[in-house]
Amino acid sequence: RRPISYSTRTGSTFASPDQSPMALYQRLFGDGFQDPNSANWSPDPNVMLRQSVLSAVTEQRQTLMRSVGQEDKIKLEQYFTALREMENQLAVQLQRPEPRDACVLPQSPEEPERAGSVDVVNRNTRVMARLLAMGLACDQSRVFNFIHTGGTSETYIAGESKIYHQITHDEPTHAQLGYQPRTSQLAEQVMEGFGAFLEEMDAIKEGDGTLLDNCLVFAFSDTGYAKIHSLENIPMLLAGGAGGRHKAGQHIHAPGESVTRVSLTAMQLAGAPIGEFGTNSMRTARPVTDVMA
């Protein structure tokens, strides 16, 4: 299957995701990792060389822009935007990091079991969450996207073969219960995976609280009623304290409201300097202020 990614700069080109704990470990704690608590620190010569090369390329920007057409200018601008972001990242790597009491270099993970059984997916999710949490604690990253299962999920209940996506369409609604029992069982197990994700963030002590107290996690499904791919009542959750900015523990029912309001709320709670979000009829400047402290 083609890997799923929601990380994009242009809306058309998406970043390649790390699909295994080992790949994520190498990205966060592999070559070039600078332990913020190490007494011995010096700039990485390889980073200095890369910064020098990027600076030389950037200096040629104006010459290139004058010699190409409008369509190529757009492509070049995207390219140079990526270069500027990379230069900023390299500049950070050349600065001595501030000490981080919560940062502990994790052990290299073992090769995970590869199966679509939701219990296996949840175990792998916990491993990935542990690495991501320590990546935040060590200031290796401040924002990330994580996909537990894709929109057409191929996970299944242990011991069975019928996949989640197929069950949502084939299973009838129980006459007495008023819902789909097997679908609900799978949804419950997926939420257990989300709970495990939060537990790993909450397990790291940071200051007077935990890492989760200082973070915000925005989680969502892509349908409200999967059987018919309904876009009404899509479940969206905000977890974590966001450094005291998030008033958690509330259920807000907002029928007919744009889901982009929740996205805008999450970004503002996380400290992003953004006043509106979305496109066309989904564009909004109204965050959900009920959850803002």
Model segments located where?
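Ligand-binding pockets and gating/stacking loops
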Residues: R1-A293
